[in-house]
Amino acid sequence: MTALLIDGNALSKTLRAQAAERAAALTARGHQPGLAVILVGANPASEVYVRNKIKACEDNGFFSLKDAYPATLSEADLLARIHELNRDPKIHGILVQLPLPAHIDSHKVIEAIAPEKDVDGFHVANAGALMTGKPLFRPCTPYGVMKMFEAHGIALQGANAVVIGRSNIVGKPMAMMLLDAGATVTICHSKTRDLAAHTREADIVVAAVGKRNILTADMVKPGATVIDVGMNRDDAGKLCGDVDFAGVKEVAGYITPVPGGVGPMTITMLLINTIESAERAAAAAA
């Protein structure tokens, strides 16, 4: 059996077209959705991510603002800029590209963003609200994964789901969203004693640790859905995920590729979160 591919590029295209329609409707009413992206330092990977986010905005009728600062920018100056953007009615989403230079406290920076403009969903107000199932914004990567399940009719209610990884950005919110959808969720991580014992029982596995081949074919239940959130490089320097794709695709029922799986969905959900913020702002102004 060869797994069916969950194509993140194709689903993204559909969702972005819907986002563009909503953006056009808002713009016609004088409320063009606006996203501000802040980059501090010259991390090459961060520069690529920021460029892709700005391009996605431009391609879909959003207003976008990119603030690029040297790595020497002080924490106080960064916080002052965030406070300015919090007050700017043209901006509906504020995103600070992580990681930040060591002298800047990323927790303090995220907490400075107004919760109603926290389109990454990282602010403690949104992270806490996710626990109750009522966040203003869901973190983009796990939100994108949930849209993939929805698009392919993958049943979550009663399913055994394993999330490998416990980060605040992917692992923890992914587990909460699966739990909210009725799955029985196990979170595994670097201290988990027997990872394979957990994954072999899982109907759904989400791998999100940033470690190549953490999930191999012998660890997967036949027919399971495997979502690969990892972004790594193989020995030849080629982009790969956390899953041994060649092996696992022969066992799984559904699988996401890397690249072209979860990655495009992350930026798409950033657009959706920004649209939702703009729609709330427009309704409040009406």
UniProtKB/Swiss-Prot annotation:
GO molecular function list: methenyltetrahydrofolate cyclohydrolase activity; methylenetetrahydrofolate dehydrogenase (NADP+) activity
Biological process (GO), any one: L-histidine biosynthetic process
Catalytic activity from the UniProt record: (6R)-5,10-methylene-5,6,7,8-tetrahydrofolate + NADP(+) = (6R)-5,10-methenyltetrahydrofolate + NADPH; (6R)-5,10-methenyltetrahydrofolate + H2O = (6R)-10-formyltetrahydrofolate + H(+)
Keyword Hydrolase: yes
One GO CC term, this protein: cytosol
Family: Belongs to the tetrahydrofolate dehydrogenase/cyclohydrolase family.
Subunit structure, as described in the record: Homodimer.
Alphabetical list of PANTHER family matching this protein: C-1-TETRAHYDROFOLATE SYNTHASE, CYTOPLASMIC (PTHR48099:SF5), C-1-TETRAHYDROFOLATE SYNTHASE, CYTOPLASMIC-RELATED (PTHR48099)
Protein name: Bifunctional protein FolD
Native species: Burkholderia orbicola (strain MC0-3)
Gene designation: folD
